[in-house]
Amino acid sequence: MTRAQSLGEIDRQLPLGEEIFLDHVGHFVPDREAARAALARAGFAPTPISIQAAPDPAGGPPRPTGTGNTTAMLARGYVEVLFRTADTPLGRELDLALARHPGLHLAALAVADAAAAHRRLAAAGFRMQPLVEMQRPVETVQGPATAAFTIARVVPGEMAEGRLQILTHRTEAAVWQPRWLDHPNGARALTSLTIAVADVAEAAARYTRFTGRAAHACEGGQVIALDRGSIALVTPEAFGRRFPELAIPSLPFMGACGIAVVSLAGVEAALRRGGLAARRDGERLVAQFPEALGIGAWVFEAIK
């Protein structure tokens, strides 16, 4: 079996042509150190803390965006933890999300050309923010480097589920460094995002416009299969049946993400070492996020 088959999808980190991938999901948290420790408790190997910045149009030094991050980088995609660093629009947006609840509030889709995606979204009727060039300093084994991204964002409120964005990675080697890709829990790929919504039909139509991909029926809702990864939009009742341990804090709710792992036994052992509970759900393992990462759950599945 090839690695592409074992991971179930495209054996490539970044998209080509018209492909669109589920690139990463983001936890919004109040305490960056506690959240980083929580990732480690769950068996991930988190990257060092990084403060995000944007180029100054006037040519001065980079300006803080208002957020910083730590990540769990995977062989395919990643999990991000974001925290506030400055009083900026992005920092205030994070505060508003935290007022609802800590947890998943961001989903980023990767494309080969974020500028083209920006034009497509505007043509599809979305109110858009200006295209953003973002960067953050990273350390590599060769020395300091910069991770750079081009990001297309809709105006806040256009996608009520959270910060939905489409981006293009400019520096794959700086972002996906081999030393950060091995995790004690065997995590290999981000595979899915599940969102509870009040009106599945409305949300599915909107996500179809946002992704450029069709929605199909799934248990309790609609699912959009991307070229890598998927987004499921389900009723609160369907979400509750699948995740009875989670109380939905408010709707809409980004409540769970799927992670492909080397083995369920391996991730179960890693969670146990971290003092975290999990339950078997058929061929899956469901584990609530540690409190420092907010409200929600991981759904771990073994690579076939």
Model-derived segments and spans:
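A short beta-strand-loop structural module common to alpha/beta enzyme folds
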Residues: P46-A54
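Glyoxalase I/VOC metalloenzyme domain signal
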Residues: M1-D23, H27-T47, R63-E133, T140-K304
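Short, flexible/disordered intra-domain loops and linkers
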Residues: A54-P64
